UniProtKB/Swiss-Prot annotation:
Protein name listed in UniProt: Probable 4-amino-4-deoxy-L-arabinose-phosphoundecaprenol flippase subunit ArnE
Organism in which the protein naturally occurs: Salmonella paratyphi C (strain RKS4594)
GO biological process: lipid A biosynthetic process; lipopolysaccharide biosynthetic process
A Pfam family per the record: EamA
GO cellular component, one term: plasma membrane
Cross-referenced HAMAP family: Flippase_ArnE
Transmembrane feature ranges: 38-58, 61-81, 91-111
Gene that this polypeptide is encoded by: arnE
Subunit structure: Heterodimer of ArnE and ArnF.
Pathway of action: Bacterial outer membrane biogenesis; lipopolysaccharide biosynthesis
InterPro entries, per database record: EamA_dom, Flippase_ArnE, Small_drug/metabolite_transptr
Amino acid sequence: MIGIVLVLASLLSVGGQLCQKQATRPLTTGRRRRHLMLWLGLALICMGAAMVLWLLVLQTLPVGIAYPMLSLNFVWVTLAAWKIWHEQVPPRHWLGVALIISGIIILGSAA
């Protein structure tokens, strides 16, 4: 169960980061202020919820086990940027993502 909470905390944290990115996107219309407030508000909600879940994780797992699992954030952000904004991800970056996933698997199996 705590593994699900950890993944959810990670996803909400990433959601907050992605909302911040979306807030910086240029608009061609005059709705810039509304756009900015919407996305920054969503970012705050996501990051606040992530923090609450993270505190639940820390009550259960040692920080030495829990914290490295947040490396998943790098994986989620890379995938989202690639799919949502069609950002270019060089092969070297994909290799890094694969190494992060491998590290998480190794650390997770030791827990």
